Amino acid sequence: MNKNICIVYTHHKLGDLIWQLPYIKAISEHYNQSVDLILREKTQAKKILKNEKYINNINYNNFRKGIFYWIDVFKLVQIYNQNKYSHVYILDKVNKPAIAGKISGIKNIIGPGIGNQKKYLTTDIILNDNDWKLNYSEQSKKLLKLHKINLNNPYPQLNINIKEFNEINSDLLYKGKKIAFGVDSFEDYKMWYEEDFVKLAELLHKKNIFDYIYLICGPDKSHITKKIIEISKKDYFIDCSKKDLTGVITAIKNSQFYVGNNSGPLNLSAALGIESFGLIVNDAISELKYSKIQFITPKNYKDNTWIRDRKNMKTLTPDEVFNFLKDKMR
């Protein structure tokens, strides 16, 4: 019997999806065939994953709650039935994809099985309930190990046709040396302050490190880029807050290096093979161990830190970040 493999991941954050790419690829390699994905539309996965040979097709589902719960379940049922999947792998603990699999009569429904999800799986090989304490990447790693699926490379990688992206976003193609600052985050407590990015830019500019800086930021936090530009009063900033992911990728791929908060674009930059520096103060660098991100932390930083106060980001100074970068550039 021919196998038809679907992998479902329900989280909306870009960074979380990027962390799952090695596990998606490992499942594809295990079956020696490309796989289908079901993801949230907010990830813009169809734009960023279209050049990955291990991915066949991507469908979107919003995985909503409340009155939309069952609407989205039956959307999943429809996708499953249309594609006649033999296997559905779920890379998080959400019940919805497993329930839809049961309704569709899928023979192999595989997932972490944490909480109620285990009721709807077709296997007893699951994580234990204490594994919810693991981060999403470690949960997926353990799930694959339990099912004897080899993970050949734990580091996320993205293959992008940069020529195509450059053509779409030609307004970002400034002449000269460019770097990128990732200035926002989904969680405010992870964000370095605007005036500190301004000071870092001044220090780097004195050393002729760049001609322009791309400011990478989501549209919902465009006030951050505006504030940086207003404080600085310099014309070397390029505001990318209105750009979609193709624009963000264009900016990052045309940068010599990336410096930014612990957020999706930082993970994206590392996956794109750009030298990437993460400003880590209030959260754990151990969560990012399967990454090529270089961490910049304040003095006396302790790993597995969980601080939910943005003011603590002030403990990492522009001078410290500049000195770290300067040492790396020697």
Where is each model-derived feature located?
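Catalytic machinery of carbohydrate-active enzymes
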Residues: M1-R330
